[in-house]
Regions:
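A structural signal for conserved, well-ordered secondary-structure elements
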Residues: 1-170
Length: 170
């Protein structure tokens, strides 16, 4: 029976953009690109390479200027140290990689093969999948590559906004 070996890469670049609330600072965007290029030839992790590149491009800038947003105001402020920001970003990246790993594991269980091998390289954000006895590689590839598009909407109860509606009517 045929087998299949796949290497999946978690996009830490996209995570960083999301954590920075889609910041359009040119130095931020350039540092993301530089870190991605350096990943090819360097054994360091993406976050280390990003921070190095950002500091090279903008020696006076603090990381909090990028990553302290309204979404994480309980953890980071504009006065947060670079070490605190780096710790936060690393935690978020680790969580994202582990969530992705769990999702991939559950998707492989759906394939129904015996003894799949799934290995995680957390520093590189890579997940290697080896599956024996694959009879439909296209289905497996589609299953592994599918992205989950989660959207969160702020919801209100009618009682929460009733006073505001009454005030608007008077």
């Amino acid at each position: 029976q045929g087998g299949m070996s796949v290497v999946l890469q978690v996009s830490l670049k996209e995570l960083m953009i999301s954590l920075a609330d889609k910041n359009n600072d040119p130095n931020f965007r350039k540092a993301l690109e530089v870190a991605e290029q350096r990943m090819v030839t360097n054994n360091s992790d993406y976050i280390t390479l990003f921070i190095q590149a950002y500091k090279e491009l903008n020696t006076d800038a603090k990381l909090a200027q990028l990553f302290a947003t309204r979404n994480n105001k309980d953890v980071l402020t504009y006065e947060s140290s670079d070490a605190a920001v780096e710790k936060y970003v690393r935690t978020q990246a680790g969580d994202a990689i582990n969530r992705t790993y769990s999702i991939i594991q559950s998707r492989i269980d759906q394939v129904g093969t015996k003894q799949p091998i799934v290995t995680l390289e957390p520093n590189k954000g890579r997940i290697t999948v080896e599956i024996a006895g694959v009879d439909n590689p296209a289905r497996v590839r589609k299953l592994l590559q599918a992205t989950a598009n989660l959207e969160f909407w702020e919801a209100y109860r009618g009682t929460d906004i009733a006073k505001s509606i009454n005030d608007a009517n008077t």
